Amino acid sequence: MIKKTIKCFSVILLACTVMFVNDYALHADNAQNWYCKREKEHLRPCIDPTMSYIEEENGFFIGKDPDEKVIYLTFDAGYENGNIARILDTLKAHNAEGAFFILENLIRRNPELVGRMKTEGHLVCNHTAKHKDMTKLSEKEIEQELCSLETLYKETFGEDLAHFYRPPEGRFDRKSLDTVRKLGYHTAFWSLAYADWDNNKQPDPAKAKKLLCDHVHNGAVILLHPTSKTNADILDDLLTEWENQGYRFGSLLEFTEKA
């Protein structure tokens, strides 16, 4: 009797282990890191077909009209190191709107900068409260990450966050995007970015400017980190160059407009 019980327990334990491993593998396979291959001659990039479902979940990465010379400036701002104010000054000088995807930390430590973003006409958007990997969270935990930032922003500034979301580190899956969509968000990916995030290994300004100018394209959603000294140094020249090429700086709100 004891042997039979142990045998049954072992079978059940094995079955549960297999189910757990299969579920974990399936979940891991579904999780993806966003990327967009840069194209030459200012051509608009395409995305991997396995990522095309983002549109079904209120996601976007590039402007709708391939013939319109428009650029969307977006910034992932988790903290301040002296460069965000410089970025804001440059945007103001060019009357260019940006979308800032912020974390809880920035509101708590630098509310004056977030206030500037708001009062100077930029969109203040949701990059989650604590920059967690959303593909590893439950629906309830995802909701908590977004809604706690919403609440803090509302309590601090008396207004609602713009309902645009950017997944931390570009990590996503259908489940997380679907949860975000149900909360009323559009997920903003990007069509042009470069390695600007490491403050201890900043890109050469001339090379960074050339890369961005060589690969800009109609409808570009550009991701920049406003903590980057390189970005703060070159942004004025970039905006001037793009203006001279006939680009306008658009608002992410255009992505929510009906055709």
Task: Name each region found by the language model.
Residues H217-L253:
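Catalytic grooves of carbohydrate-active enzymes
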Residues E68-I71, N81-N83, I87-L88, K92-L223, ...:
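Metal-dependent polysaccharide deacetylase catalytic core of the NodB/CE4 family, i.e.
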Residues I2-T74, Y79-A93, K207, L238-E241, ...:
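N-terminal pre-catalytic segment of deacetylase/amide-hydrolase enzymes
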Residues S10-L14, E39, M134, D173, ...:
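Enrichment for repetitive, rod-forming helical segments
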